[in-house]
Amino acid sequence: MSEESAAVLAALGRRGWTLGIAESLTGGALCADVVAIPGASAVLLGGVVAYATPVKATVLGVDVALLAAHGPVHPQVALQMADGVRDVVGVGGAPADVGVSTTGIAGPDSPDGQPVGTVHIGVVTPVASRTTAFHFSGDRDAIRAQAVAAALREVLAAVAE
């Protein structure tokens, strides 16, 4: 468990906001880090691992034309994933207040020519939407770990807005 996850849960809890997580390259690691914190269930509604490109469209509602034109590693894809997961994990007809997403290339190869370590993180809150691009280095595990930490920092920054 991480201090970043504890800080995210505390910040969301202070606002009375809930969280949904959509992951691609992190493969559930972000959600696992969050649920390692006792009391996470007061904030986290759920998560989706949309690893395959078609799942981003069918489950999270990412635009098929966007995926066809730009592939799964794109800032707009990250934004649509973050927005889509809010509805997917919503309870009682109400979406999660905050959605966060990770999409990128952990390596060792790049299927679409973008550099290994390219990561886009999307965050959608009731007051703002944002994506941030990162270029991490290291092996597959290091890139995934850096993406998890960056996603948590991005949620904290967005919640502070």
What are these regions (language model features)?
Residues 1-161:
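Short alpha-helical segments enriched in small residues
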